[in-house]
Every structure is written in structure tokens, then in C-alpha cells.
Amino acid sequence: MAHPKAAEVRKLTDADITEQIDGIRRELFDLRFQQATRQLSNTHRFKEARIKLAQLLTVQKERSRSAASS
């Protein structure tokens, strides 16, 4: 899974970003659960999910700040 470019993330609507953030948080919860029960074999998925979550949260924060300043 390649990391999305910032420009690709910025093209998403606010609703899409919120939906993806919720999905990634659920995925991270599932990954932690799998790791705790020793069922997880691909530990690199943690890093990928955290990076994507950070990108989405950054774009969401940028939009909220620009809306507040306008």
C-alpha cells in the first residue's frame, strides 16, 4: 500500500476525510487486537495506517483553521 500524496488527500471532501479517519482508527484498533492475540503477521501495517491517519488529520486541521480564519 503506497502512501497517498498530499494533493490526493486534499482532493477529498470533508465527509470522505472524516469517513476515512474513522475507518483507519477502526483498523488500528483491530491491528492492536490482532497483535495482542498473536494473530498479526504484518506489523508494518501499523506504520502505514498511522501515516495515512496523520495525513488525513493534517488536511482536516488545515481546512478547519482556514475556515475559522475566514
Curated annotation (Swiss-Prot):
Spans traversing the lipid bilayer: none
GO cellular component: a single term: cytosolic large ribosomal subunit
Pfam family, one: Ribosomal_L29
A biological process term (GO) from this entry: translation
Stored CDD domains: Ribosomal_L29_HIP
A molecular-function term among this protein's GO annotations: structural constituent of ribosome
Keywords for the protein's UniProt record, in alphabetical order: Ribonucleoprotein, Ribosomal protein
Protein family membership: Belongs to the universal ribosomal protein uL29 family.
Protein name: Large ribosomal subunit protein uL29
Organism: Prochlorococcus marinus (strain MIT 9313)
